[in-house]
Every structure is written in C-alpha cells, then in structure tokens.
Amino acid sequence: MAIRKYKPTTPGRRGSSVADFAEITRSTPEKSLLTPLPKKGGRNAHGRITARHQGGGHKRQYRIIDFKRVDKDGVPAKVAHIEYDPNRTARIALLHFLDGEKRYILAPKDLKQGDIVESGPGADIKPGNNLPLRNIPVGMTIHNVELRPGGGAKLARSAGTGIQLLGREGAYATLRMPSGEIRRVDVRCRASIGEIGNADQSNINWGKAGRMRWKGKRPTVRGVAMNPVDHPHGGGEGKTSGGRHPVNPQGKPEGRTRRKGQPSDRLIVRRRYATRKRG
C-alpha cells in the first residue's frame, strides 16, 4: 500500500491524502458473506448516548470474517480476491476452499491473489496460514491471535499490527503485543502467520471534517464549551476551567476506562506503561 497525496486545489484538499488501493483486486463484495449493519448513532436500547462522537456516515454492510478457521483444518484454499472492508482498517481476503465454500479472512502483508493458504497444526509457516501457538516457531511475527482456545481471534486485527512470539514454557506461550505489553497465552490458542497489511493506514491525513463525517465520526466538543444542562463542566460567565476534576457527561471521573481485576490480568508479565519514560 502507498499513500497518494492530493494537490492543494481547495483548503480541504491541502495536505490531505488517501490510500492508493493498489492491492485491491475487486470492488464488489461476496453477497453470501454480507449481513445488514443498522446504525445506532452511539445510542443504547433506551436511546441514551453511550458511545460519543458516533453517527451518520455512509451506509455499510458487514462482511462476515472467519476469526476461528478451526473447522477448515487440512482444507486448502485459494486467495480469489483482496477486498476493501469499510468496517475495519485492514484489507480482507476472499478464500475459495477446495470443498467449494467461500470465506473472508484478514489479509496479512504479502498475501496476494492466487496464493494458497491453509490451517491446522501441519500447515506451512507462510503468511495467511493459521496454526496453534505450539506449532509456530519462536520469534515469528503473528496476528489474529486467540485469548482462549476456540474463542476466536481477539488480538492484532487492525492494519499494520503484529505480535511477536517470544517463547514457550509449559502450557503457555509468551507474546509481545504491539503496545509493548508482554503476556502469556495458552499454547492451544491459534494465530495466523505474518503481520496485518495496509500498514500505511496510520499515515493518512484526512484533511477535512467532512471526510470524518463520511466515516460516521461526529465532532468532539469540550464539556467546558457546553451549557450546564449538557455537561457538568458547562456554564459560567466567560471561559472557565470547569471548576472540578475532569468528569464525563454523566459525572463519573474521566480517564479510567479499564475494569480492574480482569481474570486474564494474572497472565500479564509486563504492562505496556512499564516501558514509558516518566518525565
């Protein structure tokens, strides 16, 4: 993938860029692997906003991705197409299996149209193949990693991400996450070889607010710029600091987003913030 820069013909075009989509081989998705994706606008069942800055955007259909691949062990598949997916930053690959079934997987770097991929403990070590962690050589870069055996891939699924397999000891494999966190995972968990493609996605300059609206992202407004009815930091004469510690619109302390005491916390060897420099 490469980045194509626009000429500065308008203020919105100045400095903006777009992916060149050179790796895309088909523009229309496989109909049998589509499902409706109704828009929620960030609202829950009561109509209250639970996810801010969401709404609008171009209409989409969800592409059904195979994140397990366990039921196709030993069945080779040919990469028919590399396609664009509006629901994720990674590209997706359409596989035609030898038994006639079609499925989507996340497209790793260097996977091309016409390649043969397979899954199972005896699969070759090449991009796109899916194996248990106990069968993958130490030092290999992997993606699409499960947290629990048979639970489906949860880690390293976005564009340009990859996890390094540092070692194995007993029933666990040690992995280095893209964030720098080091954690242990059951060796029965499965992973795909290689890193996710489309790594230049993070270098795209969107250029104008309108392009973000096409993606379904709404503006981020500061609480101190609102009225008291809309936010605990709102109101006051002139500009204010908010008058209290930062809170969200519901009045809960801002910044704490992760639940303490996750069952998998005991498997974390080193947290990601341990590598940061403290100033």
UniProtKB/Swiss-Prot annotation:
| Biological process per Gene Ontology, one example term | cytoplasmic translation
Which keywords does this chain's UniProt record carry?
Ribonucleoprotein, Ribosomal protein, RNA-binding, rRNA-binding
Give the compositionally biased regions (Basic residues).
Answer: 40-58, 269-279
- What are the GO cellular component annotations? large ribosomal subunit
Q: InterPro entries recorded for this chain?
A: NA-bd_OB-fold, Rib_uL2_dom2, Ribosomal_uL2, Ribosomal_uL2_bac/org-type, Ribosomal_uL2_C, Ribosomal_uL2_CS, Ribosomal_uL2_dom3, Ribosomal_uL2_RNA-bd_dom
What NCBIfam families does UniProt report for this protein, alphabetically? Answer: rplB_bact
Record function comment: One of the primary rRNA binding proteins. Required for association of the 30S and 50S subunits to form the 70S ribosome, for tRNA binding and peptide bond formation. It has been suggested to have peptidyltransferase activity; this is somewhat controversial. Makes several contacts with the 16S rRNA in the 70S ribosome.
Description of how the protein assembles with itself and partners: Part of the 50S ribosomal subunit. Forms a bridge to the 30S subunit in the 70S ribosome.
Family under the similarity heading: Belongs to the universal ribosomal protein uL2 family.
Descriptive protein name: Large ribosomal subunit protein uL2
